[in-house]
Amino acid sequence: MSTILELNNIKKAYDVKMAVDIDKLVIEEGDCVGLVGESGCGKSTLAGIITNTVKLYSGSVIFKGEDISRFNARKMRDIYKNMQMIYQSPVASFDPEYTLGKSVAEALRNNKSDNLVSELFISVGLSAEYVNKYPGQVSGGECQRAAIARALAVKPEFLICDEATSALDVTVQSQIIALIKQLQQSRKMTVLFISHDIALVSQICNKTAVMKDGKIIEY
């Protein structure tokens, strides 16, 4: 099994407080890794470091053999073809002036076929009629499914879910967990599933990393 992500000597501080301090973390292709810890322990900061939206002080983020930690926005656009992220608040991640279908079509860039957009929606359990709905017209669970469709549009090898189900009720949460698990297995994606809920992580992940005070204390 090949390594898809390797973090080495990662350090990030805000003022005098160390937010992330990780010696090493390796994620292999095809794994579903849970990252768990209490709120404020540094999980979302680490996700930002991996996606290069949060700049680290020192260390390296090796993704598919390249250190992307110093990449500029242009270079990161190429990386985002293989790496996507789903956020805690799906509605906030969509442009309210765009239909859900248009947002997904934008992710497709050069292949904005209406049929392909509809197929993506159907693949995440949404009927084609949702293509023409706006974020404010659908439930949180439906919007999160659309967010997953948008992430899948570029056929990523690596998917980060940052508290992607925490704002949903238990029933919808279970449906989204089952969907992510099914897609991870069928598409052979690598998933980093970030959550404060260890029981939830155990349902979907084959490996678990425990974070406390910015450090990985168990993996």
Label each PLM-derived region with a short phrase.
Residues 114-129:
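Conserved ABC ATPase "signature" region
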Residues 36-38:
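The feature captures the beta-strand-to-loop junction immediately N-terminal to the Walker
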Residues 59-67, 79, 218:
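Conserved ABC transporter NBD signature motif
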Residues 68-84, 110:
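ABC ATPase NBD coupling module
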